[in-house]
Amino acid sequence: MVGGDRRFKVSKLMAYILRHSPWEFGLEPDEEGFVELADLIRAIKTVYPWVTEEFIKEIVEKDSKGRYEIRGSKIRARYGHSYPVVLKHEEDTESKVLYHGTIRENLKGILKEGIKPMKRQYVHLSLSYEDAYYTGRRHGKDVVVLLIDAECLRRKGYKILKAGKRVRIVKHVPVECISEILD
């Protein structure tokens, strides 16, 4: 069994490498963000020498949000990239309501311009209030959760993509698709 603390630390490093800085570790992602699993393991071993392929596969399998994907001998982050990637995710045509957690100080800008991806390619949305709340907590203590009308997004021509088990992504959330602010 993989220890939770070790798994958490390695998963954070994997997210950093795969989402933001593969080149810093000598990796060259393809257009979809995939790198060779063996190369990722070598990169991670420079920080955590005890890491094995089984350990990485266990992280991928047990990740509750489905952050990572292994396809053949390659691995990628499924969402959250700060560099351009082509994500060929399935469209979510069924969700009616989605959630976005943020800190209160961001509300003024959001209510003026909608939710923008900022330094990422997509806005991250959650299937549950709880997930959105905890995502918002990473940015501060005064969290608000925005209720997003998924049908409104679709009517406006936005595609909602299934990026992970409980995560959806969209290019932008216009103000008029924010249906409620939950404290």
UniProtKB/Swiss-Prot annotation:
Name of the top EC class for this enzyme: transferase
GO biological process: tRNA splicing, via endonucleolytic cleavage and ligation
One Gene Ontology molecular-function label: tRNA 2'-phosphotransferase activity
Pfam families xrefs: PTS_2-RNA
Keywords: NAD, Transferase
SUPFAM superfamilies reported for this sequence: ADP-ribosylation (SSF56399)
UniProt-listed Enzyme Commission number(s): 2.7.1.-
Classification via InterPro entries: Ptrans_KptA/Tpt1 (IPR002745), RNA_2'-PTrans_C (IPR042081), RNA_2'-PTrans_KptA (IPR022928), RNA_2'-PTrans_N (IPR042080)
Regions that span the bilayer: none
PANTHER family: PUTATIVE PHOSPHOTRANSFERASE, TRNA 2'-PHOSPHOTRANSFERASE 1
Role, per record: Removes the 2'-phosphate from RNA via an intermediate in which the phosphate is ADP-ribosylated by NAD followed by a presumed transesterification to release the RNA and generate ADP-ribose 1''-2''-cyclic phosphate (APPR>P). May function as an ADP-ribosylase.
Stated family: Belongs to the KptA/TPT1 family.
Protein name: Probable RNA 2'-phosphotransferase
Organism: Pyrococcus furiosus (strain ATCC 43587 / DSM 3638 / JCM 8422 / Vc1)
